[in-house]
Amino acid sequence: ISDEIREKDGEAAGDAYACEKAAEIVNNTLKRTGTNIIVEGADNIPKDRNFVLIANHQSMLDIFAIVSTLNRPIGFIAKAELKKVPVLRKWMTSIGCVFMDRKDMRQSMQALIDGIKKVKAGDNMCIFPEGTRTDGPMLEFKAGSFKLATKSGAPILPLTIDGSHTILEDNHFWIKKGTVKLTYHPIIETKGMPKDEQNTLAERVQEIVGSALKEEERFGKNKNINS
């Protein structure tokens, strides 16, 4: 149906429909599994302009939690391996995701360029600057991820995801009852940002994201749970 809407009303309308339906499905699924999502800072989500969402990444559940709470169409810079999962590939393509092969530098650069084009065209995009999922403590945010915002001039919406790994990743992908907390922080403007501020942007955003995590989950030794 989303493809039909794209043909009739344009790409943005198709993406909006796909995200709306995805949010309905995700919300119903999470309710059935007893997963509770708490949202703080919803007022920080821009209503009338597009943005780049920057978040820490604890679990595969993160994508679905974002879609279910954001109430805005959004695509993701996602790892290429997800294209091998037919259902995920179809759904993620329908909401405007861009797939990135981390093992192929040229393709990774092209994926970032494609993401920048989408943001310049008015789409919202999300990227996880750690580059992989972790079991809690954050990895260093990769500075290159922030080009999605600085090259497009879109504001950054920092997001902290807390607790999703205990619901999914720690249970061998069996969803258990629990609570995930999403904290949306105030936006950071990037248009016209001086070069010296761009150079420290990754550290600045990581500090903001980490401020809503327990101290032991901000930095430190962690287990990479993404092969």
Model-inferred region functions:
Residues I38, S59, K84, S108-L112, ...:
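Amphipathic coiled-coil/heptad-repeat helices and related helical stalk/stem segments
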Residues D43-N44, K83, D104-R106, G163, ...:
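Residue-level detector of flexible, active-site-proximal loop/helix-junction positions
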Residues S2-D9, D15-E20, E24, K31-T33, ...:
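Catalytic core of membrane glycerolipid acyltransferases/transacylases, capturing the structured
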Residues M109-S227:
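Non-catalytic C-terminal accessory region of glycerolipid acyltransferases
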